[in-house]
């Protein structure tokens, strides 16, 4: 991705699925941010992304190349169903290019548009400092700390931080 690329964030399309699955699996394989351990296949990925309230892709407006994604869904049910949760993934080669900021900013808009009142992150890993700084810069509030709440790929445990943002 070059600096002149026009990046847009839009709802995913079926043709995005191979890239979405690949990017999601990169983050799962890294083992330092997502709690999932199982990789998505083409079939499980299609079902997974379709089951979300909203799935977005960050794409090059000219080429359609997908560089990142997010999923948005309820964090709970019933009386807490107005609180949503999201996960973000950026292709390894495109990290550090502020794609995450575009994804989170769009997610805040989509959360509101889908009737949610709060966006909550349950488990931001302590060592994920880039994400933590981004969330704080965008107005998220850290709720506390859950000691040794995340098992890293190498087997050691790290603290996790819940965050929220009113919509």
Regions found by a protein language model. Name each.
Residues 7-20:
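A short beta-loop-alpha structural element at the N-terminal edge
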Residues 20, 24, 45:
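Hydrophobic pocket/interface hotspot
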Residues 33-93, 104-105, 110, 166-167:
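Acetyl-CoA-dependent GNAT
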Residues 95, 121-131, 149-153:
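Conserved beta-strand-loop-alpha-helix junction that forms the acyl-donor binding cleft
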Residues 96-111, 132-137:
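Conserved acetyl-CoA-binding loop-helix of GNAT-fold acetyltransferases
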Residues 111-124:
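Conserved GNAT acetyl-CoA-binding A-motif
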Residues 135, 140, 163:
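Conserved active-site tyrosine of GNAT-family acetyltransferases
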């Amino acid at each position: 991705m070059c600096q002149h690329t026009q990046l847009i964030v839009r709802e995913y399309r079926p043709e995005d699925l191979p890239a979405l699955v690949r990017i999601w699996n990169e983050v799962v394989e890294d083992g330092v941010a997502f709690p999932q351990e199982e990789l998505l296949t083409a079939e499980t990925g299609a079902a997974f992304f379709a089951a979300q309230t909203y799935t977005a892709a960050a794409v090059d407006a000219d080429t359609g190349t997908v560089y990142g994604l997010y999923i948005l869904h309820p964090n709970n049910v019933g009386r807490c169903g107005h609180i949503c949760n999201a996960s973000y993934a950026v292709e390894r080669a495109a990290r550090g290019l502020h794609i995450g900021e575009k994804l989170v900013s769009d997610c805040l808009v989509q959360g509101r548009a889908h009737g949610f009142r709060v966006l909550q992150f349950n488990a931001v890993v302590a060592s994920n400092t880039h994400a933590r700084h981004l969330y704080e810069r965008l107005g998220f509030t850290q709720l506390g700390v859950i000691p040794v709440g995340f098992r890293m790929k190498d087997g050691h445990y790290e603290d996790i931080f819940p965050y929220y943002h009113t919509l």
